Amino acid sequence: MKLSEIAQKTGASFSGEDIEIFALNSLKNANKAELSYCDGEKNAKFIAGSNAGAILISQNLTSFVPEGMSALVCENPHLAFAILSKDFAKPLFCEPKPSNIAESATIMSNAYIGSNVSVGEGSIVMAGVFLGDNVKIGQNCIIHPNVVIYNDCVIGDECHLLANCVIGSDGFGYAHTKTGEHVKIYHNGNVVLGDFVEVGACTTIDRGVFESTMIASYTKIDNLVQIGHNCELGNGCLIVSQTGLAGSTTLGRNVVMGGQSGSAGHVRVGDFAQIAARGGVSKDLDAGKKYAGAYPIMPLDEFFKIQAKILRFFKKN
């Protein structure tokens, strides 16, 4: 799609060469044939280092656009990006190609195997499983009944995916119009699970917008957990039931998230940190500490001291 067509579709004005755009991508990873966007001053610092051929940007940030990068100036770059994401979304089904199923793998009846799927030696795919196009499953995995693994997702060796979990569904991403409409952002990334990962029943892990949602090796995820788009979980994390991680949350290695805990988006939790049940992570947290509470979350010993003071206060009164 030419920049002039994109400008017409989004109501943007543009300066620079009317180049052909083949995909949308992040500022970090875009190339000369791709379009990116910047929705605020926080991300404007990344524009100079980007290789994007063009960028959706608001008028007040155009000074950050380097020479050689075309600027599509619009009132709401995030909304313009959402509108375009449908046009650049990957197709639901790709061109049919043969799949590579290892001889020692077991595929039970009623499992759907898409195009160009790979299933490693010794893996078991149970009844009712859906494997989308280009899915790769390693060796000795057990994929339990009714698991859904959407297109392009990668499952490492020795993984257990329990019944009804969903890997690689679209993330919960929308842009909003002035009249209150919510415009869907189509996600072109995927989910990558390392080795020895376990995903509990009815857990959902969303695909990234452009890149991968990453679950590193030896991480264990309980039932009924929601992991948002572009999250990154380090080695050996333990995620207890009903935890919810908002998009782009980053957990270091061996982080423990207690039951019904959660995180706001774009926060980082350091290695070996532990979040107590119902803890709410709203800011970056240091490595190796225990935390509790929600607003604000705090070190566990401080939380207990405050609870004791509250109890003494009510006993006196």
UniProtKB/Swiss-Prot annotation:
Molecular function (Gene Ontology), one example: N-acyltransferase activity
Keyword Mitochondrion part of the UniProt annotation: no
Database matches in Pfam families: Hexapep, LpxD
EC number(s) per entry: 2.3.1.191
Gene Ontology cellular-component terms listed: membrane
Gene3D superfamilies in the cross-refs: Hexapeptide repeat proteins (2.160.10.10), MurE/MurF, N-terminal domain (3.40.1390.10)
Protein name as it appears in the record: UDP-3-O-acylglucosamine N-acyltransferase
Gene behind the chain: lpxD
